Amino acid sequence: MPDHLGDDMRKTKKDDTKEEEKNFQALDEGDIAVLKRYGQGPYAEQLKTLDADIENCLKKVNELSGVKESDTGLAPPALWDIAADKQAMQQEQPLQVARCTKIITSDKHDPRYLINVKQFAKFVVDLADSVAPTDIEEGMRVGVDRNKYQIHLPLPAKIDPTVTMMQVEEKPDVTYSDVGGCKDQIEKLREVVETPLLHPERYVNLGIEPPKGVLLYGPPGTGKTLCARAVANRTDACFIRVIGSELVQKYVGEGARMVRELFEMARTKKACLIFFDEIDAVGGARFDDGQGGDNEVQRTMLELINQLDGFDPRGNIKVLMATNRPDTLDPALMRPGRLDRKVEFALPDLAGRAHILKIHAKQMSVERDIRYDLLARLCPNSTGAEIRSVCTEAGMFAIRARRKVATEKDFLEAINKVVKGYAKFSATPRYLTHN
């Protein structure tokens, strides 16, 4: 039956389909391997092999230890040795906590130890065979048996769990490159914190002691706490973070006890860095209001002053304090020897504001031709926190317009909203008036 295609047209169409079938070729293994590697970095295969080796090592460790992922975190029942555990419990008797108050030495016999069992009695005892005489000191807590009250175990100092939880275990993810507009301040901090830990011989050769305390002060939102987080990420020393309001306790003497235990725990470390945030909560100038409401806060501050530079040496402990009201701090807390260096975090300049904008815009999906210097000129007397809010609002404008990329117009609208619209909420002029 004739159709709309002629014989010539039908021949040419068949020839085209044959040529297309000839042009299509199946992918071989080499082409598939190239496609799999497309978009990967030069070290992707090495990283994969390292990840596989790490997973295999973890599997071996879990198999040897008998611990598998479970809700209870216990080993499987097939690996339990209940008979050996019962025998160990029968051989090892429970110990009682006591305190060694005095060591009595004599030439005729071995030293004796005077222990005080709380709310019970005092005994003169000797050591068990498993304890060396050099492990026991006066004033330390020990574990004694209930029969002969022999000392079987030296115990660490008793520290409040709230103080132990102040220690930062995981390092923050903030580095010095994430802090903009604070180049001079970072250098001053590194001279106090990093140089004495990495190059102590420089100070020994000069015969001086490195500064041990730094006060960070400036308007709210200028990067004081952010710099402290960057210091915690950089140093390998133990980092303890304390908020000033945590030292204000209900009962008399609790705040001073927490400060003592805090420095006792810091002295047990090889090197320690303590950061007091919002120190004006406990470090205010002393005055008498006639009612005695601030007496407990003042006692806490006096204990802090004593620990910073009192009769006992501080040791290898660096102290950072941050506040936005330095005019309210007590002069005894501010003197050199306790806080040797005062670092002011002022408002960022034009280059600092542009750097802060680039830091926050680096994590965003933005256009490439944004003029950050122009945006920085439109944000006079703005802090780093306000500039970060500008970047967040620019992203909100892009989301509202259903776009995946923020434009320069979004940043301009965000500046009008944050810098100019929220000017009445800014505390920077009030801070500059007080200080």
From Swiss-Prot:
Residues 1-23 have a biased composition (Basic and acidic residues). ATP binds at residues 218-225. Its main location: cytoplasm. GO terms for molecular function: ATP binding; ATP hydrolysis activity; proteasome-activating activity. It is found in: Cytoplasm; Nucleus. One of its GO terms (cellular component) is proteasome regulatory particle, base subcomplex. Residues 1-24 are annotated as: Disordered. It holds the Pfam family AAA_lid_3. It comes from the Eukaryota. Keywords: ATP-binding, Cytoplasm, Nucleotide-binding, Nucleus, Proteasome. Gene3D superfamilies: 1.10.8.60, Nucleic acid-binding proteins, P-loop containing nucleotide triphosphate hydrolases. PROSITE patterns: AAA. The keyword Nucleotide-binding applies. One of its GO terms (biological process) is ubiquitin-dependent protein catabolic process. Coiled coil: none annotated. Belongs to the AAA ATPase family. PANTHER family: 26S PROTEASOME REGULATORY SUBUNIT. The 26S proteasome is involved in the ATP-dependent degradation of ubiquitinated proteins. The regulatory (or ATPase) complex confers ATP dependency and substrate specificity to the 26S complex. This is 26S proteasome regulatory subunit 7. It comes from Caenorhabditis elegans. The lineage of its organism: Eukaryota, Metazoa, Ecdysozoa, Nematoda, Chromadorea.
